[in-house]
Regions:
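Short, well-ordered amphipathic alpha-helical segments that serve as non-catalytic structural scaffolds
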Residues: 22-37, 61-62, 90, 146-150, ...
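N-terminal beta1-alpha1-beta2 module of alpha/beta enzyme domains
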Residues: 7-54
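Phosphate/pyrophosphate-binding loops at sites that engage ATP/ADP/AMP, CoA/4′-phosphopantetheine
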Residues: 30-44, 153-158, 230-231, 262
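Single conserved hydrophobic/aromatic residue that forms the stacking wall/gate
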Residues: 259, 263-277
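Conserved catalytic cysteine-centered active-site region
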Residues: 4, 16, 52-109, 113-145, ...
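Condensing-enzyme catalytic core mediating Claisen C-C bond formation in acyl metabolism
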Residues: 1-22, 31, 132-136, 165-169, ...
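Active-site-proximal alpha-helical scaffold in enzymes
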Residues: 81-112, 144-178, 221-227
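Beta-strand segments within the central parallel beta-sheet cores of soluble alpha/beta enzyme folds
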Residues: 40-50, 76-82, 106-111, 162-169, ...
């Protein structure tokens, strides 16, 4: 890769009262440029990652980044969306811009404001990232979809509740040391493993500690090429970046993967087919 991170900014994640999508964008964009010691006038392109899907009435948000500085006016700005990978998609777009030589400095911003939306509407909004034609009516919303995927996985590989609890416990332990984390409390393996009033089952085998929270927050990166980065105070070089996309109907794909794995484990399947799975 030929790109580096030379500046960054991050708000806490959680219920951020008094903030708006615009204020969050402006805050992290300005802080990231300041952290990089880069003048706004030197930015060649802006990429905003914003899923939205009904969380904010302001659907066109790319130009809101320009509010961070008058010197950003007339800069190229594009909004990208890729469901849960929206922020990563924005970074990938910035990397490709630099690799193509279309800009020397790219400002990448990711934002979401979810907590101001009623819970039922949050569920409907998130389901817009599913295959609506087949998955919009699943009980439990998006958690219900992942609950079904987890159930299919359990059918194939056995009960993995211990592994899920270890993952949740590890994440919460790391959150204690992260000043931006929404929950900074070490819940421990036993709490994450045990279904209880405070950790109820949400969907399928998934408990509350296995599911992500509704949150507000924003983050920003300043990307540049290696030559420019060497002239600045700090840089983190990208060693690699990959982007793959699966079928939108994730449940159908999960079922196909389960059947394929079962079939390919049979001795009756030719080795060529088995090796291609």
């Amino acid at each position: 890769m030929s790109a580096c991170i030379v500046g960054w900014a991050h708000t806490p994640f959680g219920k951020l009262a008094g903030e708006t999508v615009e204020s969050l964008i402006v805050r992290v964009a300005g802080e990231a440029l300041g952290d990089a010691a880069i003048d706004a006038k030197d930015v060649g392109e802006i990429v905003l990652g914003h899923f939205n899907a009904g969380f904010s009435p302001q659907d066109f948000t790319a130009s809101l980044v320009l509010q961070a500085s008058p010197d950003l006016r007339f800069k190229r700005a594009t909004r990208v969306e890729n469901a849960c990978a929206t922020g990563s998609a924005a970074v990938h777009q910035g990397l490709k811009t630099i690799a193509a030589g279309a800009a020397r400095i790219v400002l990448v911003v990711g934002v979401e404001q979810m907590t101001a939306t009623p819970a039922a509407e949050v569920g409907r909004n998130l389901l817009k990232a599913s295959y609506v034609r087949e998955e919009a009516d699943i009980d439990g919303g998006f958690a219900g979809i992942f609950g079904k995927i987890a159930s299919l996985y359990f059918q194939r590989w056995g009960d993995q509740s211990d592994a899920l609890a270890r993952i949740a416990a590890k994440n919460h332990k790391n959150g204690v040391r992260n000043p931006y984390a929404q929950i900074r409390k070490d819940l421990g393996y036993d709490f994450c493993r045990t279904e209880s009033e405070k950790n109820p089952r949400v969907a399928g085998p998934l408990k509350r500690t296995d599911c992500s929270l509704v949150s507000d927050g924003a983050a920003a990166l300043v990307l540049t090429d290696v030559e420019t980065a060497l002239k600045l105070n700090k840089a983190v070089v990208f060693r690699a970046a990959q982007h793959v996309q699966d079928f939108l109907h994730v449940l159908r794909g999960a079922e196909q993967d389960r059947k394929s794995t079962r079939l390919n484990s049979s001795h009756e399947i030719p080795s060529r087919m088995s090796s291609s799975a």
